[in-house]
């Protein structure tokens, strides 16, 4: 049997490569609803199966857990089948958002075959995420935060903006595992967000709590104090979970930032493939857009406006400046960046010649590779010597005068009026 997975050791396991963060968090939430809890072996088998399933990503766009379950081999180890069964049931319970009816004029309706009138715009639905659900009949599992838990959560949301799908899914997963009180949620907010975001969230939360208290909440007693005070009681499980939902909903009401978002400055490189550029845009929008904001119109607009000039010309020529993303990808899939690297042409070496070299008279090498100096074509024009070039002529070298003997130099320093003594025959002066 596998070892029971410790929730406090690693609240959020790493997703497999190629799977979006909000999809991976759906799998984690479904795994944590298993009774008994998942083991490390179950997570290992889940990641192993998803790596295989990502090779045939027909179940991702849109997400279809029933189709994914059909790819699971029979008798697959672990509890992957149970996790997929929970996801299928949850996806069936979430009602799909109906498309808005097309606007019609009260006087006359235009015919459907009129090519001058464009079809009505249908707002794309936001990616479905699982709500926070606790196992049925499970006792309260409230546990206060530890520093390692807060650090792990902050590491996961470090690249995501407050209110984005990845941010919200990570927070939902943490709320599901720890079942925090109002005080715990306030500590988490101050640890993750800046003081400005925390202040705006506090204002939105106060307005939502006022509406909920006016509307009436199950098991809420106004005489026992405000909802925030009653939610701090670990025994008030129902009120605590109502407060958790209001705390999460306050992120969706945060006003947008006045500065340009980070994803607006993502540009396609001169030699970057178009599909890689669109993938970077998609990840940045997942991490930066508030939850519930339509992503497809922004993605289609940036996929054209921030592309390089060559891809923009291709999209303009085919009329896909604001087409569906699949048409834009197909239009640019044949484009390849120009390879500007120089290719060195290596010529094969010729075999050594059998004839002797005309410089040294030896065979086995070419004259350009000969180590002997090249003989002059004629005699030196200065000295008429045929053995050297003009640049090596000794007449061009400056003559260095020979130094005088030291004795002569000393004699020159003597005064001229001193007579030299003469020795006599007898040796006397």
Curated annotation (Swiss-Prot):
It comes from the Viruses. One of its GO terms (cellular component) is viral nucleocapsid. The record marks 130-131, 344-345 as: Cleavage. The modification Phosphoserine is found at residue 105. Signal peptide: none annotated. A motif (PTAP/PSAP motif) lies at residues 124-127. Coiled coil: none annotated. The keyword Magnesium does not apply. Keywords: Capsid protein, Disulfide bond, Host-virus interaction, Lipoprotein, Metal-binding, Myristate, Phosphoprotein, Repeat, Ubl conjugation, Viral nucleoprotein, Virion, Zinc, Zinc-finger. It comes from Human T-cell leukemia virus 1 (strain Japan MT-2 subtype A). A zinc finger (CCHC-type) spans 355-372, 378-395. PROSITE patterns: ZF_CCHC. A motif (PPXY motif) lies at residues 118-121. SMART domains: ZnF_C2HC (SM00343). This is Gag polyprotein. The keyword NADP does not apply. The lineage of its organism: Viruses, Riboviria, Pararnavirae, Artverviricota, Revtraviricetes. HTLV-1 lineages are divided in four clades, A (Cosmopolitan), B (Central African group), C (Melanesian group) and D (New Central African group). Pfam families: Gag_p19, Gag_p24, Gag_p24_C, zf-CCHC. A lipid is attached at residue 2 (N-myristoyl glycine).
């Amino acid at each position: 049997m596998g070892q029971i997975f410790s929730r406090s050791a690693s609240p959020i396991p790493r997703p497999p490569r190629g799977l979006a963060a909000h999809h991976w968090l759906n799998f984690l939430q479904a795994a944590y609803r298993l009774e008994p809890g998942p083991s490390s072996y179950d997570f290992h088998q889940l990641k192993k199966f998803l790596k295989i399933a990502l090779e045939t990503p027909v179940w991702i766009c849109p997400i279809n857990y029933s189709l994914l379950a059909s790819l699971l081999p029979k008798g697959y180890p672990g509890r992957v089948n149970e996790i997929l069964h929970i996801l299928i049931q949850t996806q069936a319970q979430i009602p799909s958002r109906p498309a808005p009816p097309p606007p019609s004029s009260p006087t006359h309706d235009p015919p459907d075959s009129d090519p001058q009138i464009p079809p009505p715009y249908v707002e794309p639905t936001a990616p479905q995420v699982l709500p926070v659900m606790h196992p049925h009949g499970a006792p309260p599992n409230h546990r206060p935060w530890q520093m390692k838990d807060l650090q792990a959560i902050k590491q996961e949301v470090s690249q995501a903006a407050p209110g984005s799908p990845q941010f919200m899914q990570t927070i939902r997963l943490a709320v599901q595992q720890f079942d925090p009180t109002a005080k715990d949620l306030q500590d988490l907010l101050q640890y993750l967000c800046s003081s400005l975001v925390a202040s705006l969230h506090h204002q939105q939360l106060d307005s939502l709590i006022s509406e909920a208290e006016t509307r009436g909440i199950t098991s809420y007693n106004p005489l026992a104090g405000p909802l925030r005070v009653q939610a701090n009681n670990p025994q008030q499980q129902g009120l605590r979970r109502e407060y958790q939902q209001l705390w999460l909903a306050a992120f969706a009401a945060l006003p947008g930032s006045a500065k340009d978002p980070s994803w607006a400055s993502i540009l396609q490189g001169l030699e970057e493939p178009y599909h890689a550029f669109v993938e970077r845009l998609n990840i940045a929008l997942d991490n930066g857009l508030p939850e519930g904001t339509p992503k497809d119109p922004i993605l289609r607009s940036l996929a054209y406006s921030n592309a390089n000039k060559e891809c923009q010309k291709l999209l303009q020529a085919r009329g896909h400046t604001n087409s569906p993303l699949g048409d834009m990808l197909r239009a640019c899939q044949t484009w390849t960046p120009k390879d500007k690297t120089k290719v060195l042409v290596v010529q094969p070496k010729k075999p050594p010649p059998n004839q002797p070299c005309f410089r040294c008279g030896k065979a086995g090498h070419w004259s350009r590779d000969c180590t002997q100096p090249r003989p002059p074509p004629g005699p030196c024009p200065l000295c008429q010597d045929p053995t050297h070039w003009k640049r090596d002529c000794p007449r061009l070298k400056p003559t260095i005068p020979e130094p005088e003997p030291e004795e002569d130099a000393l004699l020159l320093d003597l005064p001229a009026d001193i007579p030299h003594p003469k020795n006599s025959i007898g040796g006397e002066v």
